[in-house]
Curated annotation (Swiss-Prot):
This is Protocadherin alpha-13. Glycans are attached at residues 257, 265, 548. PXXP repeats lie at residues 734-737, 774-777, 799-802, 832-835, 873-876, 891-894. It is found in: Cell membrane. It comes from Homo sapiens. GO terms for cellular component: plasma membrane. The gene is PCDHA13. The chain crosses the membrane at residues 698-718. One of its GO terms (molecular function) is calcium ion binding.
Length: 950
């Protein structure tokens, strides 16, 4: 084989390889691209298909592919457009390190025929790496004795980039002691040194902190920093120094052994042992100094050693040396002058005589309290004594003679502020140092009755339920007296007054010692709503002092009164009402009304009405208003209905538990057009006593109407005469409403005080009738000025607002806190946010909401004496000359009398309180179109009849 290799075949093989290489170079080419490092995914590199001379359509059929030994995933070719792009992150420092050249070699292979192309992609460096020092803090220790221009080598920073991006420059923070020396090479920093500029002084600056910054040459440039902490080592170059070169001190001749004379202090700014100091007496030392004094070598304290004698030696001069512990010790010196002082060894003596204690707190200033004498056995200045007294006390010392003083009261005393004073008298001589003596005296202050008992507040409010047991405790009053002993002993008593017809002491009593207030008898809310009285507190001093406190006892209502029925006439039996009604009435016609009152208040007086059925399941053509008591028809009546109906109405309050009363209503049906007398006689045989009762009611109604008409005519005549007369003080005049007030006894008082009034658009002004609770203060009169008529003319245009000076009574305030839900009184008024619950109102016969209202409602927890009449904002109440208000209030009763006649088409939810079934008659009269004046007189007569029934 060797021979064959060396023979003819060898040239042929060599020629074959040369041909293959030539064909390879002919069929293959090499492309060069460049791309920056850290390029984003999809960054364009080159049109590789176009540069290789390949058609885009033949890339896929010829299986165009890219291969790389280690970095095949960094670059990729899009076979759709033949573009070479960046596929993943390229980090030049990771690929090539610090090599100057960095390339990615790819092999592009296509088949049919097989071709291989070499592609070289050069990765360009970017400035993405900052300079980095080996450590963030570098500590350097330099002795303060190092001379200037001394160099201290430093470690430079490194930058992973290449070229300009890795060319580093350094800078050092400006300072007076160091500078930076940097020598650059072509590739990297070769040497970096810290050069000392001037001599260091550790005593001035112990440590230097400098910041060394390295910046590369990239754009933008990146920086790196290292903190240089330079510690200066100490050198013993400072000697100890005393604060003074000469010290002067004094010492008493009787000083004990070990008494501190002075503590010398020398300082050495050096560090360590170079700053440790040793104290000693500087040689040569006199024997007298060694005998009398000693020095502590560590802290420099000089103390007495032997007995000093002023008469033997008055002054010592001592030289003291301070030496440090450095390798070459350095020393400092000072001179100490010790002066021995004469001793003041006798203290003053203080004597206090003629004490007048204790003293009364009303003692006048300048009064003498005690005599004080002082003495001192020393002579000269050591025997001169001065006295002083405790500061900030109402006493003073007055010198009367040499070494004699008087203790005098300087200002007024107040035992309640300070009850005793501890006084200290200090006597001090004139020695150096001086001696002193003290004497204490306790001055007590005797009490004087100068403070009256004081209550915590001037008025208390107490709430007590009615029907309380006799003798129950309702409240406790307490007064404090700042005095002492008997002057502070407080006793309590009632301030007697009359409550109505009875004495206050019949209602309540107060315990003289404890101040407990007791109710002596059961309280009745209906009789007494508010009991206001005063309790007096007096001390036992001479003379006694006292003060009063006001108690307002509100009696809270309990449901202890059942509803009471109001009968329509004197001839009716209690709880029984008889009414006649025609058969032709339609549904909703009001045929009768049950009236009841409750003496309680609040919910306890809120009444509801229920119709009791005679048999279970029985159906009758009547219903009763839940809160009005009006009995109305539920359907039109026919012939099959019984001619007589006996209805039982249950009246119930809302107390806990509820109390009830039962009313019996006898209804008799008559034919239309049949006279009541004829019907009564016709049914006399069948009904018997009931028919007789109907006859009596008819005659009674006729009589009441006649009397009422006469009363109305009398009132009209009286009003006309009063208004036509010249106005005098307190007389009735146009524009001046008359205010009617009710007292607890039911009497009426009149005044000309201005109150809110209701004015109409035409006709004379209407007189207001206002009833106030007995708990309110009495009505006060006020004179009217000349501007009254101008105000009245303005009043004709629009309603006046309610007087803000008026206040509700206690019962009214309590009742108005209760939420009243009435079924038929129209209490829900739509608002922006939905129905708004308000107080139900009692309105006049008009169906419009602008009619007059009485607020709050009947039986809604409000005392009837506190109601006032008002008109709605829309249409003021129209009234003719001489007319009375449509409604007025009976004092002491929640019933409201209606003078206007109810129209025929009124529904059962109207809130008129009293009707006697005369609506059918009114309807017939309207059809006949009788005169308005005759109609109004009859309507007023009916209302007057209602009033007389109540």
């Amino acid at each position: 084989m060797l021979s064959s290799w060396q023979g003819g075949p060898r040239p042929r093989q060599l020629l074959l390889w040369l041909l293959i290489l030539a064909a390879w170079e002919t069929g293959s080419g090499q492309l060069h691209y460049s791309v920056p490092e850290e390029a984003k995914h999809g960054t364009f590199v080159g049109r590789i298909a176009q540069d290789l001379g390949l058609e885009l359509a033949e890339l896929v059929p010829r299986l165009f592919r890219v291969a790389s030994k280690r970095h095949g995933d960094l670059l990729e070719v899009n076979l759709q457009n033949g573009i070479l792009f960046v596929n993943s992150r390229i980090d030049r420092e990771e690929l090539c390190g610090r090599s100057a050249e960095c390339s990615i070699h790819l092999e592009v292979i296509v088949d049919r025929p097989l071709q291989v192309f070499h592609v070289e992609v050069k990765v360009r460096d970017i400035n993405d790496n900052p300079p980095i020092f080996p450590e963030s803090k570098k500590r350097i220790i330099i002795a303060e004795s190092r001379p200037p221009e001394t160099r201290f080598p430093l470690d430079g920073a490194s930058d992973a980039d290449i070229g300009v991006n890795s060319a580093l420059t350094y800078r050092l923070d400006p300072n007076d002691y160091f500078t930076l020396d940097a020598q650059n090479s072509l590739e990297q920093m070769s040497s970096l040194s810290l050069v000392l500029r001037k001599t260091l002084d550790r005593e001035e600056i112990q440590e230097h902190s400098l910041l060394l910054t390295a910046s590369d040459g990239g754009k933008p440039e990146l920086t790196g920093t290292v903190q240089l902490l330079i510690t200066i080592l100490d050198v013993n170059d400072n000697a100890p120094e005393f604060y003074q070169s000469v010290y002067k001190v004094t010492v008493l001749e009787n000083a004990f052994n070990g008494t501190l004379v002075i503590k010398l202090n020398a300082t050495d700014p050096d560090d360590g042992t170079n700053g440790d100091i040793v104290y000693s007496f500087r040689r040569p030392v006199w024997p007298a100094v060694v005998y009398a004094f000693t020095i502590n070598p560590n802290n420099g304290e000089i103390r007495t050693k032997g007995k000093l004698d002023f008469e033997e030696k008055k002054l010592y001069e001592i030289s003291v040396e301070a030496v440090d512990k450095g390798n070459i010790p350095m020393a400092g010196h000072c001179t100490l002058l010790v002066e021995v002082l004469d001793v003041n060894d006798n203290a003053p003596e203080v004597t206090i005589t003629s004490l007048s204690l204790p003293i009364r707190e009303d003692t006048q200033p300048s009064a003498i309290i005690a005599l004080i004498s002082v003495s001192d056995r020393d002579s000269g200045s050591n025997g001169q004594v001065t006295c002083t007294l405790t500061p900030h006390v109402p006493f003073k010392l007055v010198s009367t003679y040499k070494n004699y003083y008087s203790l005098v009261l300087d200002s007024a005393l107040d035992r309640e502020s300070v009850s005793a004073y501890e006084l200290v008298v200090t006597a001090r001589d004139g020695g150096s140092p001086s001696l002193w003596a003290t004497a204490s005296v306790s001055v007590g202050v005797a009490d004087v009755n100068d403070n009256a008992p004081a209550f915590a507040q001037p008025e208390y409010t107490v709430f007590v339920k009615e029907n309380n047991p006799p003798g129950c405790h309702i409240f406790t009053v307490s007064a404090q007296d700042a005095d002492a002993q008997e002057n502070a002993l407080v006793s309590y008593s009632l301030v007697e007054r009359r409550v109505g017809e009875r004495a206050l002491s019949s209602y309540v009593s107060v315990h003289a010692e404890s101040g407990k207030v007791y109710a002596l008898q059961p309280l009745d809310h209906e009789e007494l709503e508010l009991l206001q009285f005063q309790v007096s507190a007096r001390d036992s001093g001479v003379p006694p002092l006292g003060s009063n406190v006001t108690l307002q006892v509100f009696v809270l209502d309990e449901n202890d009164n059942a509803p009471a029925l109001l009968t329509p006439g004197a001839g009716s039996a209690g709880g029984t009402v008889s009414e006649l009604m025609p058969r032709s009435v339609g549904a909703g016609h009001v045929v009768a009304k049950v009236r009841a009152v409750d003496a309680d208040s609040g919910y306890n007086a809120w009444l509801s009405y229920e119709l009791q059925l005679a048999a279970v399941g029985a159906r009758i053509p009547f219903r009763v208003g839940l809160y009005t008591g009006e009995i109305s028809t539920t359907r039109p009546l026919d012939e099959v209905d019984a001619p007589h109906h006996r209805l039982l109405v249950l009246v119930k309050d809302h107390g806990e538990p509820a109390l009830t009363a039962t009313a019996t209503v006898l209804l008799s049906l008559v034919e239309s057009g049949q006279a009541p007398q004829a019907s009564s006689r016709a049914s006399a045989g069948a009904v018997g006593p009931e028919a007789a009762l109907v006859d009596v009611n008819v005659y009674l109604i006729i009589a009441i109407c006649a009397v009422s008409s006469l009363l109305v005519l009398t009132l009209l005549l009286y009003t006309a005469l009063r208004c036509s007369a010249p106005p005098t003080e307190g007389a009735c005049a146009p524009g001046k409403p008359t205010l009617v007030c009710s007292s607890a006894a039911g009497s009426w008082s009149y005044s000309q005080q201005r109150r809110p009034r209701v004015c109409s658009g035409e006709g004379p002004h209407k007189t207001d009738l206002m009833a106030f609770s007995p708990s309110l203060p009495p009505c006060l009169g006020s004179a009217e000025g000349t501007g009254q008529r101008e105000e009245d003319s303005e009043c004709l245009k629009e309603p006046r607002q309610p007087n803000p000076d008026w206040r509700y009574s206690a019962s009214l305030r309590a009742g108005m806190h209760s939420s009243v839900h009435l079924e038929e009184a129209g209490i829900l008024r739509a608002g922006p946010g939905g129905p708004d619950q308000q107080w139900p109102t009692v309105s006049s016969a008009t169906p419009e909401p602008e009619a007059g209202e009485v607020s709050p409602p009947v039986g809604a927890g409000v005392n009837s004496n506190s109601w006032t009449f008002k008109y709605g904002p829309g249409n003021p109440k129209q009234s003719g000359p001489g007319e009375l208000p449509d409604k007025f209030i009976i004092p002491g009763s929640p019933a409201i009398i209606s003078i206007r006649q109810e129209p025929t088409n009124s529904q059962i939810d109207k809130s008129d309180f009293i009707t006697f079934g005369k609506k059918e008659e009114t309807k017939k009269k309207k059809k006949k179109k009788k005169g308005n004046k005759t109609q109004e007189k009859k309507e007023k007569g009916n209302s007057t009849t209602d009033n007389s029934d109540q």
